[in-house]
Amino acid sequence: MQEMSRRNQHFTDSVIRRMTRISNECGAINLAQGFPDFDPPKEMMDRLEVVSHEGPHQYPITMGAPNFRQAIARKCGHFMGRTIDPETEIVATIGSTEAMVDTLFALMNPGDRVVMFSPFFENYRAQVIMADCEPVFVPLNPPTFSFDPNVLEDAFRGGAKAIIICNPSNPSGKVFTEEELKTIADLCIRYDVYAIMDEVYEHIIYDGRKHVYMNSIPGMWERTVSCSSLSKTYSVTGWRLGYAIAPENIMARIRQYHDFNAVGCPSPLMEAAVVGLNMPLSYYDEFSAHYAHMKKIFTEGMRNIGIPFTDPEGTYFVLADISPYLKKGQSDVDFCEQLARKAGVGAVPGSSFFNEPINNIVRLHFAKKDETLYAALDRLNHIKDMM
């Protein structure tokens, strides 16, 4: 038989989804894959029930149902501080994952270089490679996960065409400051680089910090694509609804790839999601307060147990240091498998997020009901006995 594609020969299956499968097999509490165990807003579920009987159930307009795009334009326009045209500057996608892939194919040519920070969400490397591009990594330095502007400029100077930024950042929990984003923006403008933003955690930020949108920085709207989804903000990770926002000339290219890649998003889910997108502003305050509550439970529990970790500025992830529990020669992958099978808690090995040779970090998440978090902490409290 003829040779299969070489595009995916250098990456494996998703480590995150693998840990979910292992957690399911052994009945572990899944703190690996970042999805909640509580319901989305009741208003959205009630609307979905009605839509299930009334429709729509057929193909939508490829770019997304008009009322869905209009709701995104209103909601995002408020938070971004600009008017967004739903007819020319938005496309609905199958989660932010598809938005990122469509954007890469719309902007990049084979061999182009894409800068990303390390640690990074594992999908980014695979997506860049699938686009026949070269990933270039710039380290975020713990514990604050700051970056060296000179190192970043070296990466740009080497011929970068785009930079991918997750803000707030998965897995580090870093929230990029306005000053940091302006530093990146200056480099993007100077070296003519596109900014591809993954902003799915935009409303999960702690301790009075503020999410700054890259496309709101002067000179950046013209070269920025903002990718996001409803998965986190409305607790509907299984609905797979996302979107991209970009200037008209870029959006026209993204829509072409979306059209032939996905045809469209699920019609009934877009209809039900409009209710969520039209929630009053108080919803986002209550949503943020709920996540601050879950974070407090989990981080206080981790401190009481004595597991070292990095306190996140945003997102619902914690990077924990497993150095005290690693056996000699044990990999972080094996540790996580044993943690799921013996301690009953699912985690993700940190090596799947870092370009650097990391073996002592795991990622845990706390988007769970109180009782789930307390049960997970109780199991982690016996980690020394069970490993």
Residue ranges of each PLM-predicted region?
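Helix C-cap/helix->beta junction micro-motif
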Residues: 26, 131, 190-191, 305, ...
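PLP-dependent enzyme catalytic core of the Aspartate aminotransferase-like
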Residues: 74, 154, 328-330, 338-347, ...
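Active-site phosphate-binding strand-loop segment of PLP-dependent enzymes
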Residues: 140-207
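Conserved PLP-binding catalytic core of the aspartate aminotransferase-like
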Residues: 291-292, 305-342
